[in-house]
Design a protein with these regions (language model features):
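ABC ATPase NBD Q-loop/coupling interface
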Residues: 14, 63-80
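Interfacial catalytic loop of ABC nucleotide-binding domains
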Residues: 76, 100, 121, 138-140
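Conserved ABC ATPase signature
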Residues: 140-144, 148
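The feature captures the beta-strand-to-loop junction immediately N-terminal to the Walker
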Residues: 39-41
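Short helical segment in ABC ATPase nucleotide-binding domains corresponding to the A-loop/adjacent helical element
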Residues: 93, 102-110, 120, 124
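Helix-to-loop junction immediately C-terminal to a conserved catalytic motif
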Residues: 54
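Conserved ABC ATPase "signature" region
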Residues: 117-135
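Conserved structural motif at the start of ABC-family nucleotide-binding domains
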Residues: 3, 21-23
Length: 151
């Protein structure tokens, strides 16, 4: 699987007084089997660039190609792109946003279009693997300890 960014530009709040260019004409190619490191100062655009790789956000201009195909050409194919390109955040415990532990873990499978039964099976299995039992399912994710959140 190769990923290409061609002249990628991303502008936040474009056309407003808060306009901020986060990425400016970035061109990059990642070949199949290649590993890269992305480093930079706070606010340099690292997270913005990463969010483009699986279509979480769309560029202001330029294109993202997955195996030569523009990922934004057909919005219906974004689900498949996201199955192929996953993101792992540095501090995943800061990415919690659902009201319950169960719903937070179910977010991914739900957005992949799994059935309710498959979602339940995946959530229970995932939580069991990391040692979080059913007594936590209906609690807020923010009631978990730091270690539990990371798991």
């Amino acid at each position: 699987m190769s990923i290409q960014l061609n002249h990628l530009t991303h502008v936040y709040n474009e056309g407003t007084t808060f306009e901020k260019v986060a990425l400016n004409d970035v061109t990059l190619e990642i070949q199949t089997g290649e590993f890269i490191g992305l480093i930079g100062h706070t606010g340099s655009g690292k997270s913005t660039l990463i969010q483009h790789l699986n279509g979480i956000i769309s560029p202001s201009s330029g294109e993202i190609l997955l195996d030569g195909e523009n990922i934004h050409k057909d919005k219906a194919k974004l689900k498949e792109v996201r199955r192929r390109i996953g993101l792992a955040f540095q501090y995943p415990e800061y990415q919690l946003f659902e009201m319950t532990v169960y719903k937070d873990v179910a977010f991914g499978p739900t957005n992949l279009g799994l059935s309710a039964e498959q979602i339940h099976e995946n959530v229970v299995a995932a939580l069991n693997i990391v040692g979080i039992d059913e007594t936590f399912y209906e609690k807020s994710p923010f009631e978990l300890s730091g270690g539990q959140k990371r798991r």
